[in-house]
Amino acid sequence: MQKLIIHGGKPLKGSINISGAKNAVLPIMAASILTDKLHITNVPKLTDVSTMKDLLRSHGADIKILEHPDEFELIINTGNINNFTANYEIVRKMRASIWVLGPLLTKYGKAKVSLPGGCAIGARQVDLHIAVLKAMGATIEIEDGYINASSKGRIKGTHFVFDKVSVGATINAILAAVLAEGETVLFNCGREPEIVDLCNCLIKMGADIAGVGTSEITIKGKDSLNKASYKVLSDRIEAGTYMFAAAITKGDVKICGIDYHIIENIALKLIETGLKVVQINNGVQVTYEGKLNSVDLETNPYPGFATDLQAQFMSLMTLSSGVSMITENIFENRFMHVPELCRMGADIVVRGNKAVVRGVEMLKGAEVMASDLRASVSLILAGLSTNSKTVLHRIYHLDRGFQDLEKKLSNCGADIKRV
């Protein structure tokens, strides 16, 4: 099994280009089921993208892949969908597989999707996905680990209030509603940039969607959608991760190819810690200026601080000048990186959904193991900060969400290699 060997202590200096957003491209790929042809650019080279390609092909899609140095270009033809079951063997690899449920149901009146897998960071139930589709008139049963959904004729528009903000359920509801009969109004929706990107793609395909980027989205169903071409937005989680990498290594890095407004909350949090963060053309520049203040953090739905960056921020706070409180409001079990950080000398105490982080002068290299995607990269950041050697095991998680991570870090002076 592959591992990463990191020799830390080298400030990162240079520039990093940000790849397409994983959490945007996956629902956009699922949206291809709603039309006959979708051309997608700025597609990141990730195993989760490969899994979604495998899933769409299992449904009968024909996918042409054009490979460029820093991205994929996908041409997805879905005019011959002939299988309406998303099998366990594919779905177990990635939770995003559930996003074929809405498109298959709304276009073909039936879908059978295995209950999903993915990172082991909490229950992340599918109750809200099922509830909103039932409100649209679907008949849904859970049998033998599968969601069986069907409808007599087209599903119907509805008014639905999510009892809590759910990015995944918001996406499935939108994907279903664009071909539903009548008007759907969704309340308490996720407002994440990736949801906005999906809506913009659907609008380009001919969907009628209002309220994009707000908590109330109105969708007037269409009889069909058009072919389209769409460029996926850049990955704010990747951008934030490299911003923290610059900070934890006391470096100076330009993060390029990202819209500032979707990473502004990250930039403001770093400024609180004492970092210099300057908006530049097509990105930001993060510079360490000799201090690292301890700052409290709470994760919340967008525009709050992303749960997908909590672990990385915690790594940074292990080296801060005081005590910080990190509160995880989105997922349970998302402190699984804490024992590994403590193996490296961090002083962290977890109490329920809160972690108290007392800054130490320096972390020490160690052999550590990744439990999930974001935890794995937090341990890399910790390793980069040390003056010794860190070995990270179970790095297959990384390839699900970070394209060319070692190359991007090495180009800025990091000593990191995969063996």
Curated annotation (Swiss-Prot):
EC class (word): transferase
- Any idea which residues bear 2-(S-cysteinyl)pyruvic acid O-phosphothioketal here? C119
The principal location of this protein is cytoplasm
Which protein is depicted?
UDP-N-acetylglucosamine 1-carboxyvinyltransferase
Compartment list:
Cytoplasm
The biological process GO terms on file are: cell division; cell wall organization; peptidoglycan biosynthetic process; regulation of cell shape; UDP-N-acetylgalactosamine biosynthetic process
Residues holding phosphoenolpyruvate:
K22, N23
HAMAP family membership: MurA
Cellular component terms per the entry's GO annotation: cytoplasm
Tell me the organism: Rickettsia felis (strain ATCC VR-1525 / URRWXCal2)
Gene3D superfamilies according to UniProt: Enolpyruvate transferase domain
